[in-house]
Amino acid sequence: MNYIVTAAHRSEFPYPITLHRGQALVVGERYEGPEGWEDWYLCEAEGQQPGFVPAPVIGRDAQGGAFATEDYCARELDVDPGQPLRGVRTLNGWAWCVPESGEAGWVPLEKLRLAG
């Protein structure tokens, strides 16, 4: 799916949490904000800064511990209006996008429109 950026977005998290499937997590508070982004949790993983992880990526074991159900990176893209992006996945109000150059990352869906 191709998108065009409609509003600038700047990441506030320079050190995004990056998880590997099966990696242990400590799940903290649920994000509550005016944006309406549902089911994001502040999580910690060994050796990393805390970061937000969407509920579908958080699994629970029989003892109540948490783990990553898939590989995941919380990297957000810095984008500007008019910029084209290729969307790979949407999750909980965000799109994982690939810019024309540079690394992929998350952008809020509210700052995107479908191209074409």
Predicted regions and their residues:
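Src homology 3 (SH3)-mediated interaction modules
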Residues: 1-116
